[in-house]
Amino acid sequence: MNSKVGNKNNKRAAGSIGEAAAVQFLKENNYEILETNFRYRRLGEIDIISREKDYICFVEVKARSSLGYGYPREAVNIRKQENIRRLAQIYLCKNRINDLKVRFDVVEVYMEKKGDDIEVKEISLIKNAF
C-alpha cells in the first residue's frame, strides 16, 4: 500500500516537472502564458492556457518516462478532449475573449529517471492536436 502512495507522489512530481518544462518550452517559442492549471468547479483542469499570435491555445501536457503505455498524446482521449473543450468555452466566456482563434495543443514531455532525479530528455509540441 505504501508503494502505491509513493508511486502517486512520484507521478505527481513527474507531472509537475513536465508542466514546468512545457511552460518554459512554450515561452522559449514565443508563447505568452496566460494561466496554468485553470480549474472550474469540479469539471477538471486545463494545464496551460497561452497565446501565440492571434491564437489562444489550450494546452494539455502529457509526460512519460517510457512508451510502455503508449505515446503521451494517446492519453488525451475523446473524453479528455471534450472536457478540455468545455473548460475552454467557460474560460473564453468568463474572460470575454472573442477576438482570438482557438487552438487545442498537446505538449509531450519525455523524461528519464536518474536515481532520485527526473531529467527532461525531449519536448514536442503538437499544434491542433484535436
Swiss-Prot record:
Coiled coil: none annotated. InterPro entries: Restrct_endonuc-II-like, tRNA_endonuc-like_dom_sf, UPF0102_YraN-like. One of its GO terms (molecular function) is nucleic acid binding. Transmembrane segments: none annotated. Belongs to the UPF0102 family. NCBIfam families: PRK12497.1-3, PRK12497.3-3, YraN family protein. This is UPF0102 protein Cthe_0758. It comes from Acetivibrio thermocellus (strain ATCC 27405 / DSM 1237 / JCM 9322 / NBRC 103400 / NCIMB 10682 / NRRL B-4536 / VPI 7372).
